[in-house]
Structure formats: C-alpha cells, structure tokens
C-alpha cells in the first residue's frame, strides 16, 4: 500500500504536456525584367507539439517563373512547390482515447511507473478505465512519418487579340 500511496497526486496533465515552441524561417529572391519574372523561396518550419515526444518539421522550396515572347503575345511559365515533412511521435485523434484527453481524465492516485519500474496501468473499475497516457507517448516517441510532396504546373498563354487569348496548362500533384 505504501508504494501506491507514496505516488498519489500524479499530475497527469503535466506528465503528458510540454511547452511547444515554433520556429519558421524563409529566404526569398525575386526579380523581373521586361520579358521575365521570377520568384524563388526556401522555407523551414519546426514545431514541438503540446504532447511530449511529438514534433513536426517541414522544408519547402518554391519557384515561379514567367517569360514573354513573340511581341509579348506569348507567355510561358511554371509554378513549382516541393515540401518534405517529418512527423515524430504519436499523431492520432481517436476521439476520447488520446493522450491529451487521458491527461486530464486520468486518476491522480495512479503513478506513472509501478514499483518494478514499468509503466503503471489503470484498467479497472472506478479508475476511469484509461490507458497510461505517458506510456503511450513514450512508447511511440521514435515513430516517424516522412512525406514528400511535389506540386507544380507549366503553362502557355497566347494572346490572339486584346480581348481573346488561349491558355494551356499541365499540372502534377505527387505525394509520397
């Protein structure tokens, strides 16, 4: 009984949450001449989530160019974006069965660890029948989801008259 009562008053919310700093950096370059316009950007975004052991990082690249020819009647160009995402940790939203929900519902009498040093459980009557939210986050801290996305199009526009033009474009959206 001492082993249980000495760990009373577990602050589950504090056990599963953390400060969540965010940082975002971008570098842009753009310019134009009479016959061309261009814009390039490189970005980095990083965020720790409010739940421990979870984070998100993204690197993105964007390029837009446009060129004029044939007495300024023809315009060709492209728009291209590439991004690489890295998610670390547990990213689920299972209604009420997630670490955030359990963090405020879990009984404070239950410890994070049992007397053997293993994660303590709580499946039982009158204890909320919830899982150990800290254990769930900790066990998934090395889970990773990597995603690459390529999105772009090329186009050509020809001005037949000032009131009439023809445009053709081809685009792609690749996710992997």
Task: Give the role of each language-model region.
Residues 1-8, 49-54, 60-151, 167-176:
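Surface-exposed loop/interface segments of Gram-negative outer-membrane beta-barrel transport/assembly proteins
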Residues 2-28, 41-51:
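Short strand-turn segments of transmembrane beta-barrel domains in outer membranes
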Residues 12, 56, 153-155:
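Aromatic-residue hotspot detector
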Residues 18-36, 43-45, 135-174:
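Outer-membrane beta-barrel transmembrane strands
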Residues 39-41, 77:
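Beta-strand residues in well-ordered beta-sheet regions across diverse protein folds
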């Amino acid at each position: 009984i001492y082993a249980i009562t000495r760990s009373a008053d577990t602050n589950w919310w504090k056990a599963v949450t953390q400060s969540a700093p965010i940082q975002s950096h971008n570098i842009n370059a753009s310019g134009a001449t009479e016959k061309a316009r261009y814009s390039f950007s490189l970005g980095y975004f990083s965020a720790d989530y409010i739940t421990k052991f979870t984070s998100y990082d993204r690197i993105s690249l964007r390029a837009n160019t446009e060129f004029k020819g044939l007495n300024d009647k023809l315009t060709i160009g492209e728009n291209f974006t590439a991004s690489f995402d890295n998610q670390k940790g547990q990213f689920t939203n299972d209604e009420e069965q997630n670490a955030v929900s359990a963090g405020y519902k879990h009984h404070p009498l239950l410890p994070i660890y049992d007397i053997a040093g293993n994660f303590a459980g709580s499946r039982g009557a009158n204890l909320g029948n919830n899982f150990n939210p800290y254990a769930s986050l900790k066990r998934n801290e090395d889970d990773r989801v990597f995603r690459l996305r390529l999105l772009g199009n090329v186009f050509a526009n020809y001005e037949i008259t000032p009131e009439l033009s023809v445009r053709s474009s081809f685009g792609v959206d690749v996710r992997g």
